[in-house]
UniProtKB/Swiss-Prot annotation:
GO molecular function: (3R)-hydroxyacyl-[acyl-carrier-protein] dehydratase activity
Domain of life: Bacteria
Protein's cellular compartments: Cytoplasm
Organism annotation: Aromatoleum aromaticum (strain DSM 19018 / LMG 30748 / EbN1)
Annotated catalytic residues: 47
Protein's UniProt name: 3-hydroxyacyl-[acyl-carrier-protein] dehydratase FabZ
Family under the similarity heading: Belongs to the thioester dehydratase family. FabZ subfamily.
Amino acid sequence: MDINEILQYLPHRYPFLLVDRVLEIEEGKRILALKNVTMNEPFFPGHFPHHPVMPGVLIVEAMAQAAALLSFKSMGVKPDENSVVYFAGIDNVRFKRPVVPGDQLLFDVVITQSKRNIYKYKGVARVDGELATEAELTCALKTLS
């Protein structure tokens, strides 16, 4: 799935769209997605000027965006002005290594549970095969009035 298709499934836009490509997707099960981290990211000038590091919360947000892509593709629907996926919870987050300009983050996210409109996931983010971040995520699909 290239960026043009991703834009059909996620409402996020620059500077908050954090998934560049989907490499693999098994609907209802798993997604493998990536984010190319460059020095041009808007957060690097302030985090940190002398040693740029991607904020951990944005790594987790990117993981959640990959999870949302998996959910929408699995349901066979595209979001519209009447639906949104909310990030509802994060558990057991661990940051194992810093992510810096030039890194390519690879997100591997699996659905562990789904009930009605609530989805739970287990996700990991790796750089060059090395674990950078892991987390358990909960998202809720909400239909707006």
